[in-house]
Regions:
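Short linear loop/turn motifs
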Residues: 98-101, 235-239
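Extended alpha-helical surfaces
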Residues: 88, 109-116, 128-143, 203, ...
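C-terminal structured domains
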Residues: 2-24, 239-278
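Extended, regular secondary-structure scaffolds
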Residues: 212, 230-231, 236, 250-251, ...
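The feature captures two recurrent sequence modes
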Residues: 1-191
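Glycine-rich, compositionally biased intrinsically disordered regions
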Residues: 75, 172, 189-191, 226, ...
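Extended, Lys/Arg-enriched charged tracts that mediate electrostatic binding to polyanionic substrates
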Residues: 168, 172-180, 184-229, 238
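Short, hydrophobic/amphipathic alpha-helical patches that form generic packing surfaces
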Residues: 79-86, 153, 157, 213-228, ...
Length: 278
């Protein structure tokens, strides 16, 4: 059954999801978005679209209109789904981070998971936690490209079958906690310091990378932080970059080394709670 916190209506795409994935879905709390939340959305989108029109892959701007993403207001799931169904996809709201294997399985079923939260003003150019700007304005536009959406589905299909290790689960919980603390304005410096130390310790003691860890790395450096085209003059297509004006400007600087995307990328770890690249 869907999460009892909210009663949700499943559509033709999400009805095909395995029932054990329903527990991650929540009803988008649209009425809880404040005027400040809406202002944050408008500000980030206006800055991003104006900048990205010259440095992003062509499919980004085309996808903004195809998927019903407005610069003026936070999108509603119902509106997005009416448009996404035409390209065989759907969107669901989730509560922040979900486990990597669940994320991959949603993707394998052509379902885009969208965190219902929105970043605070403090993190307006970059957020350490998943939010609706990252998911809706970063991921959704690019999946309107047929070739890319099929790539994403296949990636999810393979990733959902990858084997995780106990260390992967520990890392997921540690990163989830750290991202929540960093985004919460009421968090103490001591709690953030302690959570950061926990993540750093785990990162240094992961041992041999599991299948899931390698898939997660591959996913991160393409779907989230991928560049495409000439390595000396690339275009942006990764959702993490498309939804972060700070990171999208940083990544194109000549001082940032651009690396070819190869199978070796599966060995390159990352810290989700820090701006990329770092």
């Amino acid at each position: 059954m869907p999460n009892k916190k909210y009663q949700i209506e499943l559509n033709s795409v999400t009805k095909k999801l395995p029932k054990y994935l329903h527990k991650f879905i929540v009803k988008q709390p649209y009425d809880e978005y404040t005027a400040q939340n809406q202002a944050v959305w408008r500000y980030v989108m206006m800055l991003s679209v104006d900048y990205l029109k010259t440095v992003s892959h062509d499919s980004y701007l085309e996808g903004i209109s195809k998927t019903g993403i407005s610069i003026d207001y936070i999108p509603k799931m119902e509106g997005m789904n009416r448009i996404l169904k035409d390209i065989g996809w759907a969107a669901v709201s989730v509560d922040g981070f979900i486990p990597p294997n669940a994320f991959m399985e949603f993707q394998a079923h052509n379902v885009l998971v969208i965190a219902s939260e929105i970043r605070t003003i403090k993190h307006i150019t970059y957020t350490p936690a998943p939010d609706i700007i990252h998911e809706a304005a970063g991921h959704a536009p690019i999946i309107a490209d047929p070739e890319y959406s099929e790539y994403l589905r296949r990636f999810g299909h393979i990733g959902s079958k990858a084997i995780s290790s106990p260390k992967d689960n520990e890392m997921y919980e540690a990163i989830r906690l750290l991202s929540i603390l960093k985004e919460n304005p009421n968090s103490s410096k001591e709690s953030i310091k302690k959570a950061t130390a926990s993540v750093n310790k785990l990162q240094k003691n992961m041992g041999e990378l599991s299948e899931m860890a390698k898939m997660r790395n591959l996913h991160w450096w393409t779907v989230e932080y991928g560049l495409i085209g000439d390595i000396d003059n690339p275009k942006i297509y990764g959702a993490g970059l498309l939804s972060s004006i700070g990171e999208s400007k940083l990544c194109l600087k000549k001082s940032v080394k651009k690396l070819p995307y190869t199978i070796k990328t599966s060995e390159v770890n990352f810290d989700i709670t820090k701006p990329q690249p770092h």
